[in-house]
């Protein structure tokens, strides 16, 4: 049986996973660094890289034990090799290449974004093509997923990623880290129409997005308030999340139009939302409603596979393994790596 070992270390989670040729996740271990970074209110790259260095061996041993797998039974090793915080990417990639060399098994370099892009094929076995909204702390883009290694970016943020905006606003409100889940929790108790925030370039007519102005507007409001109690925090969180929903819903319409100009007579009309922001239940509901208006089904992975994980890396590796797309061991990890350049 084919078994792919996946390794993910592009940001602050050390993750290792093993999946089979039948898309079965035998084990999916994630060692979080949230506690280490919380005191700084964000991820510190050097701390993240050092933690990956000490965590990877532990994670690998846990995965092998949990899956009852021997290293010699691994068919190939897939590892995130960009984009991301380059220190962590190098640590994970070197670890994977060392295993590949020692075991004499193929090494497969995976683009982290491709891992997110293909997650729905792991969980729901959806066919190509489909429209993807990749929304995370580092990226926000609409992508036409036409086939393996056939990706066309329809639009992306011109400044901040949507996940970054969530984290920064959470920090302004003195909420915990990571901020996305904190904003979502507080928004449930707030009035989403209490504050009106700008929706930058919402009428641009293309699929590009902007969140920097929205973030600045929230900061300006907070600085102008004499008192910030729980009610105010909840209202700001709800109004901010509502505005994000409005922006993404509007841009989804633009993306659908651009996608349909590219794809003719597609039987399966699927839209996938992936990345950490895809775990937000409010945004899932808003975007699902918008997708249905155009006859599309919105698909999102289970919450534990929305955020960074190694199962998605292993699956992307499986697709490449099945097509004999292996990577030389002298591959150079990349801090930046466009999906269209794979």
UniProtKB/Swiss-Prot annotation:
Its cofactor is Fe(2+). One of its GO terms (molecular function) is N(6)-L-threonylcarbamoyladenine synthase activity. Fe cation binds at residues 112, 116, 308. It comes from the Bacteria. The gene is tsaD. Binds 1 Fe(2+) ion per subunit. Belongs to the KAE1 / TsaD family. The keyword Cytoplasm applies. SUPFAM superfamilies: Actin-like ATPase domain (SSF53067). It is an enzyme of class 2 (transferase). Required for the formation of a threonylcarbamoyl group on adenosine at position 37 (t(6)A37) in tRNAs that read codons beginning with adenine. Is involved in the transfer of the threonylcarbamoyl moiety of threonylcarbamoyl-AMP (TC-AMP) to the N6 group of A37, together with TsaE and TsaB. TsaD likely plays a direct catalytic role in this reaction. This is tRNA N6-adenosine threonylcarbamoyltransferase. Gene3D superfamilies: 3.30.420.40. Keywords: Acyltransferase, Cytoplasm, Iron, Metal-binding, Transferase, tRNA processing. One of its GO terms (cellular component) is cytoplasm. Its EC number is 2.3.1.234. It comes from Rickettsia canadensis (strain McKiel). The keyword Thylakoid does not apply.
